[in-house]
């Protein structure tokens, strides 16, 4: 490369080195009490939240959660970079497990000597050659250090939204400007309650009158009634979820509640995702009942059972994931 331009593209969220990292290394080398708490403090400061850690011989194993980086590869890299700065020299291998909803996503085993050597030269591709990626089943009993998390934990935000109806004999466009309150309550590990509540600020639905005369079950065709009668305070989502990772490559979910604006449901899903393969297979089944038009807690008479088989295929060259689904949908 004869160009004067730096071949590494700068990131907007660049890594900030830890101040006095040499002093932190000395303290971390005294005993595991300081080693674990150093990892907890400095990872948490970078929004990489340590869930568990253990040192065995020359290996430091950590499990972390995060929602800051969209790239899980970058997040794991930031964990490795942080640990490399603050861990004593006796640690030769990092075993880093990414965790989501108390389920293991993947584990990266990193040879520290190779990582440190190539990282300093910005040879990231060479550094990655000595990283082993494996499927993971997050097991708390494997770890010596497990910082206590105080539950429940509540995340929420208020944001604007627009509901739209485009095309039709009543007019080309009808819209509803709304305020939405979104909430996620972590009741405990693996158990969450999702909720979305909204209310109208301004709409022009008064002239929207088009009704459906379909002979098929009205699972979606009553959209006009939902738009008009749900203009005031409506519960768009109120769903309890339980996630599990019973074995490597296998993930499960059980859900119940007001699963969307038109239907309540109870059911579950299973996803088989072989770690080193480019495909995944999912099965889901739900008992669904149609909600009232006001979108509160009432229901209509229509109910059905849905079941889907899903196949996911990832094409690595163009980074495209194809989804094929078949089964019984809401209308049969």
For each predicted feature, which ranges?
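Transmembrane beta-strand segments that form the barrel wall of outer-membrane beta-barrel proteins
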Residues: 1, 63-66, 156-168, 193-195, ...
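Feature captures outer-membrane beta-barrel proteins of Gram-negative bacteria and organelles
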Residues: 1-6, 177-187, 236-246, 265-285, ...
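Short flexible/disordered coil segments
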Residues: 112-127, 254-266, 272, 314-324
